[in-house]
A protein has these predicted regions:
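Interfacial aromatic-anchored transmembrane helix boundaries in multi-pass membrane proteins
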Residues: 45-60, 81-122
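Membrane-helix interface "capping/anchor" motifs
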Residues: 25-33, 68-80, 117-119
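Hydrophobic transmembrane alpha-helices
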Residues: 1-67
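Generic transmembrane alpha-helix motif of multi-pass integral membrane proteins
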Residues: 21-23, 61-77, 108-112
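Membrane-embedded alpha-helical hairpins and interfacial helices in multi-pass inner-membrane proteins
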Residues: 1-15, 53-55, 95-97, 117-227
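Structural signal for the C-terminal ends of transmembrane alpha-helices
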Residues: 19-28, 111-116, 195-203
Length: 227
C-alpha cells in the first residue's frame, strides 16, 4: 500500500495542504504566540512518542496543539498542529502525512473552546467526542492508503481485529478511528483544561488574541472559555 498510486496521491494532497496552511497562518501570528509554539511542539512529540512506544490505542500527540489553541485561538492552534507534524516528520517520517489533520485538530479545538468547551464537564465531553469523530474521519484515509492501517502499534492492533472480522481496509481503519480518536481528543481537552487552570492569569491575558490591548473589561478566563 505504501508505494501505490493511492498512497502517493493521498500523501501529496495532505502534505501540500499542510504547506499551504503554514504559509497562510504563520505570518499572521504575533511574536508572543510564535514564541510558545516550540514548547507545544516538544509536548506533542515527546508525549506522542511515549504513548506510541507503550502501545496504547490512543495518540495524545496534540496536547500542545490544543493548549495553544486554548490560549491563543484557532489560527494559532492550526499553525501549531501543522508545524508539529512537519517537525516531527524530520524525526519520524510517519508523522508528516498527518500534518493537515493535525492542523485541523488545532483549528477545530480552538473553535470548540471558544464556543465554551471548557465551561462545563458535559460541554467538554461533547466537544471531545465531536472533535474526535471529525479528526478520525480526516485521518482514516491517510492511515489506510499511506500506511495500510498500521500507523500505530495500539491502533494497528484494533485495525487488525476489524480486518479479521471481514471488514475492508478503509472500513477497519475508519471504525478504529471512531473508537480511538473521540477518546483521545476527550483526554487531550481534559489535559489542556487542567494546564490552562494552572497557568498564571497574566500569561492567559498576554497570549489570548488581542493580547494586552484587550485586557481591560474582560476576565482572563473568558479568553479560553473557562468559568
Amino acid at each position: 500500500v505504501g508505494g501505490s498510486t493511492q498512497a502517493l496521491i493521498t500523501l501529496a494532497g495532505y502534505v501540500g495542504g499542510a504547506a499551504l496552511l503554514l504559509a497562510a497562518t504563520l505570518p499572521a501570528l504575533p511574536a508572543r504566540t510564535i514564541a510558545v509554539i516550540p514548547v507545544a511542539l516538544v509536548l506533542n512529540i515527546v508525549i506522542g512518542q511515549v504513548v506510541g512506544a507503550v502501545g496504547l490505542p490512543l495518540y495524545l500527540d496534540s496536547v500542545g496543539t490544543v493548549l495553544v489553541a486554548a490560549l491563543a485561538g484557532p489560527v494559532a492552534g492550526l499553525a501549531t498542529g501543522t508545524l508539529s507534524s512537519v517537525v516531527w516528520g524530520l524525526l519520524n517520517p510517519a508523522a508528516l502525512p498527518f500534518a493537515a489533520v493535525a492542523g485541523a485538530t488545532g483549528w477545530l479545538a480552538g473553535w470548540f473552546i471558544r464556543a465554551g468547551a471548557f465551561r462545563t464537564i458535559w460541554r467538554l465531553v461533547v466537544s471531545g467526542l465531536l472533535l474526535g469523530l471529525i479528526c478520525g474521519a480526516l485521518a482514516a484515509p491517510v492511515a489506510a492508503f499511506v500506511y495500510g492501517g498500521t500507523a500505530g502499534v495500539g491502533t494497528g492492533a484494533i485495525v487488525s481485529l476489524f480486518r479479521e472480522l471481514g471488514n475492508s481496509l478503509i472500513g477497519s481503519v475508519t471504525m478504529q478511528s471512531f473508537i480511538s480518536d473521540p477518546l483521545d481528543k476527550l483526554a487531550v481537552l481534559a489535559i489542556a483544561l487542567a494546564a490552562v487552570k494552572a497557568l498564571p492569569k497574566r500569561t492567559l491575558r498576554s497570549l489570548r488574541p488581542g493580547g494586552e490591548e484587550q485586557a481591560a473589561g474582560a476576565p482572563e478566563e473568558r479568553a479560553v472559555g473557562v468559568r
